[in-house]
């Protein structure tokens, strides 16, 4: 079984390491490519049999009947793919998220941080932004500073474990 990813230690390689750990050793050959698009092309060209990608990157191919979604790494099912189970539903204790955060320099004055947080929250919850996300097959998972820090701490540990399990990096 050949697994394609967007590259070594990348956002689409790490989930395989997490699944490997949760499944107790998945026997696959890794085919790193130069990005998500080439990883999907590897599947479409029958050079690989599986990949991990975002819903938005694969949705057009799923709708065209060229790819079959098997599971999602999130804790809940995707709104775009409600019939596709989570890995946890299938008995694998693992989660993985592709996310985007907004950061400021550590020395940024608190009033500026609060102004930025308020503006970002307002923009993130706007109808225009939500519509744009939905059109791209994405879902809003907004977390403000303290909640994002909690997520960051858990996700950072999960990511560290995945990188170490792949090898060549010491814990």
Map each language-model feature to its residues.
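Conserved, function-defining micro-sites of small-solute handling proteins
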Residues: 1-171
């Amino acid at each position: 079984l050949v697994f394609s990813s967007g590259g070594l230690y990348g956002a689409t390689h790490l989930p395989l390491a997490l699944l490997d750990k949760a499944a107790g050793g998945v026997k696959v050959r890794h085919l790193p490519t130069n990005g998500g698009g080439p990883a999907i092309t590897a599947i479409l060209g029958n050079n690989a049999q599986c990949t991990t990608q975002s819903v938005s990157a694969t949705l057009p191919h799923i709708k065209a009947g060229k790819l079959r979604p098997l599971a999602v790494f999130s804790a809940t099912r995707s709104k775009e793919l409600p019939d596709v189970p989570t890995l946890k539903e299938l008995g694998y204790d693992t989660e993985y998220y592709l996310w985007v955060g907004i950061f400021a320099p550590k020395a940024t004055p608190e009033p500026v941080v609060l102004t930025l947080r308020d503006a970002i929250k307002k923009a993130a919850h706007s109808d225009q932004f939500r519509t744009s996300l939905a059109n791209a097959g994405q879902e809003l998972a907004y977390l403000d500073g303290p909640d994002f820090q909690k997520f960051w701490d858990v996700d950072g540990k999960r990511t560290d474990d995945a990188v170490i399990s792949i090898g060549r990096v010491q814990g």
